[in-house]
Amino acid sequence: MNKTITPSIDSINRQWYLVDAENQTLGRLATEVASVLRGKNKPSFTPHLDTGDFVIIVNAEKIKVTGKKGMQKLYRRHSGRPGGMKVETFNSLQERIPERIVEKAIKGMLPHNALGRQLFRKLKVYKGSEHPHSAQNPQVLSITTNELVK
């Protein structure tokens, strides 16, 4: 009888990927990045282990959403105090903190436990095209989307 081989933490080879979010659709980008963070693109994927890679996302302020989501999509946060609910639209949050939009979309697609928090720490999102991780020699990860042509 064959036994399932669980990769050891030392044997996991982690790579760094660079993703340009310019003119990408938010959800389609987030699903691909979440899959790479989990390690589902590797043959050694194990659901209960962190086998994923590091992902750097640049140009977060140029990400797109379809339809009227720019005005209608709401982001909520609460200070924990009575009456402390703050509501903000996609457009206003994109002007203020565009990194948070991408981070929140990807975080919702990761496991909601300690493993998900560990995976989320391997995501680096930046507003502009510059990032401080050039020493890691990130590979460019191209994400192609099937867009409808009007």
From Swiss-Prot:
Region (Disordered): 130-150
One annotated GO biological process: translation
A Pfam family per the record: Ribosomal_L13
Highest taxon listed in the record's lineage: Bacteria
Entry keyword set: Ribonucleoprotein, Ribosomal protein
Composition bias, Polar residues: 134-150
GO cellular component term, pick one: cytosolic large ribosomal subunit
GTP-binding recorded as keyword: no
Any one Gene Ontology molecular-function term assigned to this protein's record: mRNA binding
Family: Belongs to the universal ribosomal protein uL13 family.
Subunit structure: Part of the 50S ribosomal subunit.
Described purpose of this protein according to its UniProt entry: This protein is one of the early assembly proteins of the 50S ribosomal subunit, although it is not seen to bind rRNA by itself. It is important during the early stages of 50S assembly.
Protein name: Large ribosomal subunit protein uL13
Species of provenance: Prochlorococcus marinus (strain SARG / CCMP1375 / SS120)
